[in-house]
Amino acid sequence: MTTTINNEHKKLNVPNLRFPEFQGEWITYKIKDVLSIGNGRDYKHLSNGEIPVFGTGGYMTSVDECLYDGETTFIGRKGSINKPFYYNGKFWTVDTLFYTHSFNGITPKFTYCLFQTINWLKYNEASGVPSLSKDTIEKIKIMIPGLEEQNKIAKLMFALDERISTQKILFWVSMRSFIASKSLAILLCSFALGSNTFVFLIDFKERFLIVVPVSSDVK
């Protein structure tokens, strides 16, 4: 988010790029003004079930009770604090993962889009394992538009995410087919160089290396 200046030289809280049908400034809030941050809890007293349990690394196991049912964005309390992810449905979270709920003037999907733009490592409170506190998150200032504009932005961003995910799947399916066709005994790895990602296949039988450049969208 940046500010622009109108013809009267007044600073306006609006993005440089915007859908043309929307006008008016985005309003500044603290996160705590528009949603609540929920704490995860221990799940070991629960029985096995069909409700997923999430930690900072993603899915862990399934239990028979839910901590919350609905749309949410998860954000790590400890560990991977800079990888928020969206979920819709019943779930349980452990105490290393926060979740959002009780939205007021902000939609759950736009919350996810907004959380993707925050430099969470900037708010790290530990010298060892990265950590965030609920109090710190709640005080972060954000700018949000009206609900109609939020919905349009979120619809576009989720469509892009889906397209990227599809391209990832197609790439790895093609790669597996290539490996199978060559009957390779390989080590499959990837590395990033600048904005580009490369995948390389090491064949221990024939002793050769194949390096495949991949779009920066596929990691």
Per-segment meaning from a language model:
Residues N16-V53, R176, V211, K219:
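Non-catalytic DNA-recognition/assembly elements of restriction-modification systems
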Residues G55-Q116, E125-V129, S133-I137:
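A short beta-sheet element
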Residues M1, F19, G24-I27, K141-R176, ...:
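Amphipathic alpha-helical segments
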Residues M1-K10, V14, C189, N196, ...:
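Intrinsically disordered, low-complexity and often Lys/Arg-enriched segments
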Residues M1-T3, K11, F115-E148:
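Short, flexible domain-boundary/linker segments around small modular repeats
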Residues P15-L17, D95-F98, D135-K139, K155-F158:
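Positions in alpha-helical segments
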Residues W172, R176-L209, S215-K219:
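Low-acidity, Ser/Thr- and Arg-rich intrinsically disordered low-complexity segments
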